[in-house]
């Protein structure tokens, strides 16, 4: 297979998480359907409507990638995941729902410079510590 025949696309986004049970419960509570129950808590896969979200223990993911497990930073790591909604009201409702489920609201819904409407919440199950 040549490099030209490889179709560029993301099929799985994997998050290294500090607490698998808590992370699995959190993403299920947001309404994402879990795929492949046979894996138990070793890894969790969620259907996100095209791309799969995978949760994997932080240290195991570092080991699998062949990189040292560094201390978990408490600052922004340069990655966000977008959840597109149909309206501003739906964005606000999604943010409120996430906060009710234990996340920290980082930025309430507001107009963006690029013509959208967005907000941010921090998934505390991905990292240990305070946001």
Predicted regions and their residues:
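N-terminal beta-strand motif that seeds the catalytic metal site of vicinal oxygen chelate
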Residues: 1-24, 36, 78-83
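Vicinal oxygen chelate
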Residues: 2-6, 95-131
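Residue-level marker for the onset of beta-strands and adjacent loop->beta junctions
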Residues: 11, 41-42, 79, 105, ...
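Core segments of cupin and vicinal oxygen chelate
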Residues: 14-62
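Residues at or immediately preceding the N-termini of alpha-helices
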Residues: 20, 88-89
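Short amphipathic alpha-helices within nucleic acid-binding modules
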Residues: 26, 89-95
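Short connector loops at helix/strand junctions that flank enzyme active sites
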Residues: 48-50, 74-78
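Short, flexible, mixed-charge acidic loops at enzyme active sites
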Residues: 59-72
């Amino acid at each position: 297979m040549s490099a030209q025949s490889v179709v560029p696309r993301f099929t799985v986004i994997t998050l290294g998480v500090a607490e698998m049970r808590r992370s699995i419960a959190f993403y299920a509570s947001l309404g994402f359907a879990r795929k492949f129950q046979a894996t138990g808590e070793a890894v969790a896969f969620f259907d996100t409507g095209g791309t799969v979200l995978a949760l994997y223990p932080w240290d195991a993911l570092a080991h699998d990638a062949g990189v040292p497990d560094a201390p978990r930073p408490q600052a922004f790591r340069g990655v966000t995941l977008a959840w597109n909604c149909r309206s501003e009201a739906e964005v606000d409702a999604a943010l409120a729902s996430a906060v009710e489920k234990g996340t920290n609201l980082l930025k309430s819904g507001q107009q963006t410079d690029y013509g959208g409407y967005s907000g941010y919440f921090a998934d505390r199950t991905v990292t240990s510590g305070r946001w």
